[in-house]
Amino acid sequence: FQAEDGIRDQPRSRGLGDVYKRQAVSFVLAGTGVPVAKHGNYSATSKSGAANVLKSLSVNIDCGIDMVQKSLDNVGICFLLAPKHHSAMKYVGKIRQEIGIRTVFNLLGPLSNPALVKKQLLGVYDKSLILPFAESLKTLGSTHAWIVHGSDGLDEVTITGKTYCAELKNGLIREFSINPSDIDIPSAKLTDIIGGEPEENAKEINELFNGKKSTFRNVVILNSASALVATGHANSLEEGAGKSIISLDSGEALRKLEELIKITNS
């Protein structure tokens, strides 16, 4: 099993429950034609993990490898539940939940996508991890990647202010930063972009895909644009934002969600 492009589930950031935005981004990317191999788990240190949100969206996340491959081949997006594809993970999940704080697994998880994707956007929960992760991805064979950390502490591209970034491309690493104003997206407060329980997050994703204009839409567009640049499917944030908006407004992102629900439950 292998996918050329992908956006992975990142380490939790302060337990703020922000992971649901990345689920929306995955479907937006798939709606632009980028194959997406999501790798994630149930929440261990935050309100809502990738698996929690997708389950609330009615996606069957307990699929075997054959169905995962079929989803990627036929829909353009798949989800790999960590305990099913890394057998050791199922023995530590309960312990991680009981501990309730970040552990080494928050660092190992983003580096262990079973799809072996070579291009990705990856968020880290501390600015000091940006370069070490870039070096690690280089060693693991990634060809193009962005590693990001929001100045507000989020492990994603933020719209509250600056996002610190490192780009790995052709074996070279460069550092830079981006701001929402770079593509004319208004800034927002941190409280405006933090998610809640899985059901709430799923509801907001469905509303987004059905045309709701909101701060959530803005942060999804900025993260999707960044992911398109990071995977070589856009040459600039402006181009990436344009493709992301088309994916949302044309209904392609929603169609990808509906197709994934259908195929994983067939």
Describe each region flagged by the PLM.
Residues 14, 41-46, 85, 151-152:
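Acidic, glycine-rich active-site loops and adjacent beta-strand->loop/helix elements
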Residues 33, 55-62, 67-266:
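Glycine-rich anion-binding loops and their surrounding alpha/beta cores
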Residues 18-71:
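A generic, well-ordered mixed alpha/beta core segment in the N-terminal half of proteins
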